[in-house]
């Protein structure tokens, strides 16, 4: 659905009054996963020249083997147990295998993807896989603005009036403004 929506925007950018050089994808948590794989799919199949990808505490690896995934097994709000359930539901039609464009870290080639902003939270089971995905993008010569936010947890920005949430939202907005210049 995400890729179809992106293709619709691309195919109809003129009637939608959208600059075709200022199309980005983004999401948080599972939405970050969808945005990342949508960028990969777009490069490989739709040839849509995305200008940016914004990945906020993204799910990136179906294997769930990082130290933070093992450490935050039962933390409140989001944890490894809930993450496992998410993957089980997401991949329920693919027993025993992970299809292409499901787990961003499984991609063999990350070259020619759009620049990225990747934010990870200190007390999040997804922290390490987000950091590893940022590293893998950098190794593919993708420009990454990585933001490892101290003292935060998965979904902290739900409390949007908290000072740290306001600060991170401002940083995200500035990253988008820079991408859209």
Task: Describe the role of every protein-language-model region.
Residues 1-181:
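Alpha/beta-hydrolase superfamily serine-hydrolase fold, recognizing
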């Amino acid at each position: 659905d995400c890729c179809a929506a992106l293709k619709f925007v691309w195919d109809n950018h003129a009637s939608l009054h959208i600059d075709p050089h200022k199309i980005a994808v983004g999401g948080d948590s599972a939405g970050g996963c969808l945005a990342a794989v949508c960028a990969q799919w777009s490069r490989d199949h739709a040839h849509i020249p995305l200008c940016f990808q914004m990945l906020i505490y993204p799910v990136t690896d179906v294997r769930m083997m990082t130290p933070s995934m093992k450490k935050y097994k039962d933390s409140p709000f989001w944890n490894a147990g809930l993450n496992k359930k998410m993957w089980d539901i997401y991949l329920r039609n693919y027993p025993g295998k992970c299809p292409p464009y499901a787990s961003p870290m499984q991609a063999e080639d990350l070259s020619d993807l759009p620049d990225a902003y990747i934010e990870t939270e200190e007390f999040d089971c997804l922290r390490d896989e987000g950091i590893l995905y940022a590293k893998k993008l950098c190794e593919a010569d993708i420009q990454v603005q990585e933001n490892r936010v101290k003292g935060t947890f998965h979904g902290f920005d739900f409390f949007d009036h908290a000072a740290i949430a306001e600060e991170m939202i401002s940083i995200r907005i500035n990253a988008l403004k820079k991408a859209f210049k």
